[in-house]
């Protein structure tokens, strides 16, 4: 984590100089590869493998990531446009160093019982890391690979919000709100805003379900995420006829992104939690990287699907996206119970706890 953070900070500072652009990108790529999977796996290490609170912990982590994504264009973008991009990229480097400082000093603020628990786990984990991969581990890895493949379908549809949905919004939405012409680019801010608003709501809802022993398993939550994503594009399918040849209300877009974001929160952070629960200790970071790679392939597939936007027509295109999402949801729901058996877990993968 430290090495990755410092490499990214150096990369951001190098971006301030135009001649260093490509070496800076290399530093950012290498740094992100070290930083992201390892930090994510450490979130899981704060809890026991079967602890139901992991899903909610990753939700909080995910909210923090998106808070940074919301702030970065406001701070770095404003500095870049007003004072020059040297300052914008320099601010990003400073922000990375501030984040590392918070990470370093925050490690000393863990509760005493958690520190003792982590020390006990550290001893056990040291032994486990040197143990050979078992047949049970291989079956779990195979299950994770399968879920990563299904995850590609989710991201292929989800990433249309920055692609074809933006094109549709530019041409079919009336951006005039009470006499104020809203820049269409502001649409891209809806998703991080909704993540910040919905995260505490969904987290509390899961806690409420946990107290009643009705909290869904991680795989079921991911199925719900795909289901919500499909519903969001069914909304788009319906509004095409309602809007017709004219322009529609901005609320169509807001409602679609709201449902789409709820689907994201049911899948993305939960997927991170699921990988943390099932991965062999020596492979947690690598398998986290594999999970992130599924979104990479999802983005590639999203670009391919986007090529059908003009040729299929809007209604057929949105129905296709909804169908892909709903099929992925069905796959998640169907494999939920077999996966629990495949993972050799007699109890639920989450073993819901009342304590938040």
Regions found by a protein language model. Give the residues of each.
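Helix-loop junctions at membrane interfaces in 12-TM secondary transporters
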Residues: 14-25, 235-254
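A membrane-interface helix-boundary motif in multi-pass transporters
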Residues: 78-94, 215-220, 248, 307-327
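Cytoplasmic helix-loop-helix junction between adjacent transmembrane helices
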Residues: 33-63
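Helical-face signature of the major facilitator-like transporter fold
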Residues: 21, 25-33, 151, 155, ...
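Loop-to-transmembrane helix entry
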Residues: 53-60, 165, 172-197, 211-224, ...
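Intracellular loop-helix junctions on the cytosolic face of multi-pass helical membrane proteins
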Residues: 49-50, 76-183, 202, 206-212, ...
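Glycine-rich segments within core transmembrane alpha-helices of 12-TM secondary carriers
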Residues: 53-81, 88-99, 188-195, 285-302
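Structural signature of the two symmetry-related core transmembrane helices
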Residues: 1-14, 18, 217-235
């Amino acid at each position: 984590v430290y090495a990755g953070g410092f490499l990214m900070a150096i990369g951001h500072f190098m971006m301030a100089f135009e001649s260093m652009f490509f070496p800076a990108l290399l530093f950012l790529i290498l740094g992100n590869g070290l930083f992201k999977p390892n930090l994510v796996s450490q979130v899981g290490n704060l809890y026991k493998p079967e602890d139901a609170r992991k899903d909610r912990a990753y939700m909080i982590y995910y909210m923090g990531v998106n808070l940074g994504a919301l702030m970065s264009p406001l701070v770095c973008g404003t500095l870049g446009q007003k004072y020059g991009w040297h300052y914008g990229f320099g601010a990003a480097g400073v922000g990375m160093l501030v984040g590392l400082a918070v990470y370093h000093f925050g490690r000393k603020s863990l509760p005493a019982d958690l520190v003792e628990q982590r020390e006990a786990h550290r001893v056990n984990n040291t032994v486990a890391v040197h143990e050979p991969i078992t047949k049970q581990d291989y079956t779990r890895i195979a299950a994770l690979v399968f879920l990563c493949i299904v995850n590609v379908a989710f991201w292929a549809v989800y990433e249309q919000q920055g692609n074809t949905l933006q094109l549709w919004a530019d041409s079919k939405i009336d951006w005039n709100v009470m006499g104020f012409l809203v820049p269409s680019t502001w649409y891209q801010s809806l998703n991080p805003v909704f993540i910040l608003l919905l995260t505490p709501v969904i987290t509390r809802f899961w806690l409420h379900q946990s107290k009643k022993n009705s909290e869904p398993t991680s795989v079921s939550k991911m199925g719900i995420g795909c289901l919500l994503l499909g519903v969001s594009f069914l909304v788009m399918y319906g509004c095409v006829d309602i809007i017709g040849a004219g322009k529609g209300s901005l609320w169509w877009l807001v409602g679609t992104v709201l449902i789409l974001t709820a689907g994201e929160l049911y899948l993305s952070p939960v997927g991170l939690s699921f990988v943390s629960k099932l991965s062999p200790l020596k492979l947690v970071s690598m398998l986290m990287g594999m999970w992130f790679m599924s979104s990479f392939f999802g983005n590639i597939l999203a670009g391919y699907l986007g090529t059908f936007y003009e040729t299929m027509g809007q209604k057929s295109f949105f129905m296709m996206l909804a169908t892909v999402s709903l099929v992925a949801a069905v796959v998640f729901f169907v494999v939920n119970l077999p996966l629990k058996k495949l993972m050799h877990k007699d109890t639920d993968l989450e073993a819901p706890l009342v304590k938040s």
